[in-house]
């Protein structure tokens, strides 16, 4: 989760890092994006997306899971098993230096990072799907820029980002239970800073095609929505355009203020079903009880996700009694108090249902 605020996005993981976003001029609505590639194989494999659905072995599925911070160290797999966690979205806070395989490294920011393959191996051994998602970029001076709220192709590190993402795709191309998300929560929370749906389409085409240029990489690629990941407007406007000539795309939305506030279970079911009916395969890659304001209600959303069989992942699997979004206390119990709307036990009940 990266918190949404006017003109600023920030995320408190280990330390608070301030984002100084660089916003450049972007495509206007009149521009025509590049033609989609057409190298789609016949869609097959363990995990696929077909006709707006997420499938496992050709059967529609709903997965329930969490966002994890295992790049900082592996978590207790048995505890995750006890909660019934089926999918883990892994936080990559230092994409440039993140080790893919081998051993842990101490990076330029002074933080130790554990290799992605080690995380995947642990998840796989416990029958969990892994989503690898870049959340931040650390430069040679050890300064981190979080990706949330940014226009991807406007960043000065964008080509280096593409190169690293291709290396990740190359390494995991024969591991179908590893899905790659192109970017965490892009674009301004209120569609400012030069945003347009045409820009979203052009950027997503470029980032998706960058991964598909890796020979043999056919696994699921995850594409975020606009408004820092909370809006489906871009998906409904240009999702089918992005899907044309491409395969195994899965879209990712995040449920915070724009979903949890001023909504009911019924209205959320209608909203979710509108996306599903449009033939747009999507997951709710994050849901949490707090973002930039007060603690929010969440039970109505979980009820709607259950009713629509929407794959859903909580923010966040972490042992921190002081963090309202952490599912666990410091000692590994469910973090559930009146202060956080009993988030730990509420989400565990959703997982076990």
Set out the residue ranges of the language-model regions.
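N-terminal secretory signal peptides that target proteins for export/translocation
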Residues: 1-8
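Sec-dependent N-terminal signal peptides
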Residues: 8-16
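C-terminal motif of bacterial Sec signal peptides marking the signal peptidase cleavage site
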Residues: 22-25
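Bacterial signal peptide processing site
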Residues: 27-29
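N-terminal carbohydrate-binding accessory modules
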Residues: 31-89, 97, 103-106, 342, ...
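Extracellular glycoside hydrolase catalytic/binding regions
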Residues: 43-48, 63-65, 70-74, 149-153, ...
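Aromatic-lined substrate-binding rim segments of carbohydrate-active enzymes
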Residues: 74-142, 149, 153-163, 167, ...
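A short acidic, helix-capping loop that chelates divalent metal ions and anchors anionic groups
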Residues: 96-100, 140-143, 188-192, 323-325
């Amino acid at each position: 989760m990266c918190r949404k605020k006017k003109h600023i996005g920030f995320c408190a993981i280990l330390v608070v890092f301030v984002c100084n976003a660089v916003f450049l001029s972007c495509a206007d609505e009149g521009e025509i994006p590049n033609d989609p590639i057409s190298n789609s194989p016949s869609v097959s494999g363990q995990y696929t997306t077909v006709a707006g659905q997420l499938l496992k072995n050709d059967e529609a599925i709903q997965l329930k899971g969490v966002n994890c911070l295992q790049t900082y160290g592996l978590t207790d797999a048995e505890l995750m098993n006890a909660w019934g966690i089926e999918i883990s979205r892994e936080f990559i806070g230092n994409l440039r230096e993140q080790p893919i395989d081998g051993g842990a490294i101490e990076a330029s920011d002074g933080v130790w990072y554990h290799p992605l393959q080690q995380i995947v191996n642990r998840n796989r051994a416990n029958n969990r799907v892994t989503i690898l998602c870049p959340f931040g970029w650390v430069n040679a001076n050890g300064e981190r820029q979080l990706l949330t709220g940014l226009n991807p192709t406007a960043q000065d590190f964008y080509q280096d980002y593409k190169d690293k993402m291709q290396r990740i795709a190359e390494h995991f191309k024969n591991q179908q239970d590893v899905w790659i998300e192109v970017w965490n929560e892009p674009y301004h929370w209120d569609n400012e800073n030069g945003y347009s749906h045409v820009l979203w389409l052009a950027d997503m085409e470029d980032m998706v095609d960058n991964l598909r240029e890796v020979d043999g990489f056919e696994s699921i690629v995850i594409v975020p929505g606009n408004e820092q990941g909370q809006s489906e407007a871009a998906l409904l406007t240009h999702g089918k355009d992005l899907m044309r000539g491409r395969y195994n795309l899965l879209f990712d939305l995040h449920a915070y203020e724009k979903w949890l506030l001023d909504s009911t279970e019924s209205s959320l079911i209608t909203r979710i079903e509108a996306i599903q009916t449009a033939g747009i395969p999507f997951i709710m890659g994050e849901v949490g009880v707090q973002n930039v304001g007060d603690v929010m209600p969440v039970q109505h959303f979980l009820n709607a996700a259950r009713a629509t069989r929407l794959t859903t992942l909580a923010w966040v699997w972490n042992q921190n009694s002081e963090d309202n979004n952490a599912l666990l206390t410091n000692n590994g119990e469910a973090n559930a108090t009146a202060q956080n709307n009993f988030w730990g036990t509420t989400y565990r009940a959703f997982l076990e249902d």
